[in-house]
Amino acid sequence: RSTFPTRECPELLCQYSCNSQRFAELLRTEFKHRYEGKITNYLHKTLAHVPEIIERDGSIGAWASEGNESGNKLFRRFRKMNARQSKSYELEGILKHHWLYTSKYL
């Protein structure tokens, strides 16, 4: 963790940025059959915005916490919408709803 990553290790930020752009381009061109030339929002954020997050916060810890909070928010919403009497049925419903919500094939 660095307090000022742009001053203390700018070469690492630049290296990450260049590598992430190359990786995104590789996914887009070489795996068209799999991703239809598109990538998920989470992967886009990882590849495109992590250098900005590191510059701003000094690490990706805040970004990881943001992802956890977002996931918890989704599960709370699904749980509220799909509340059932039995805990096992409730969890099953939440997981199925989450799978349907996140599946790119459906």
From Swiss-Prot:
Residues reported in the UniProt entry to bind a divalent metal cation: E69
Keyword Hydrolase: yes
Keywords, in A-Z order: Chromatin regulator, DNA recombination, DNA-binding, Endonuclease, Hydrolase, Metal-binding, Multifunctional enzyme, Nuclease, Nucleus, Transferase, Ubl conjugation pathway
Matches recorded under Pfam families: RAG1
The protein's required cofactors: Mg(2+); Mn(2+)
GO CC term (a single one): DNA recombinase complex
Superkingdom as given in the UniProt entry: Eukaryota
GO molecular function (one): metal ion binding
Catalysed transformations (reactions): S-ubiquitinyl-[E2 ubiquitin-conjugating enzyme]-L-cysteine + [acceptor protein]-L-lysine = [E2 ubiquitin-conjugating enzyme]-L-cysteine + N(6)-ubiquitinyl-[acceptor protein]-L-lysine
UniProt key word Metal-binding: yes
EC number: 3.1.-.-, 2.3.2.27
Residues of the signal peptide: none
GO BP terms: adaptive immune response; B cell differentiation; chromatin organization; T cell differentiation in thymus; V(D)J recombination
Note on cofactor: Binds 1 divalent metal cation per subunit. Mg(2+) or Mn(2+).
Compartments, record wording: Nucleus
General function of this protein: Catalytic component of the RAG complex, a multiprotein complex that mediates the DNA cleavage phase during V(D)J recombination. V(D)J recombination assembles a diverse repertoire of immunoglobulin and T-cell receptor genes in developing B and T lymphocytes through rearrangement of different V (variable), in some cases D (diversity), and J (joining) gene segments. In the RAG complex, RAG1 mediates the DNA-binding to the conserved recombination signal sequences (RSS) and catalyzes the DNA cleavage activities by introducing a double-strand break between the RSS and the adjacent coding segment.
Family statement drawn from the similarity comment of this UniProt entry: Belongs to the RAG1 family.
Assembly with partners or alone: Homodimer. Component of the RAG complex composed of core components rag1 and rag2.
Protein name as catalogued: V(D)J recombination-activating protein 1
Record organism: Ginglymostoma cirratum
Lineage of the species this protein comes from: Eukaryota, Metazoa, Chordata, Craniata, Vertebrata
Gene that encodes the chain: rag1
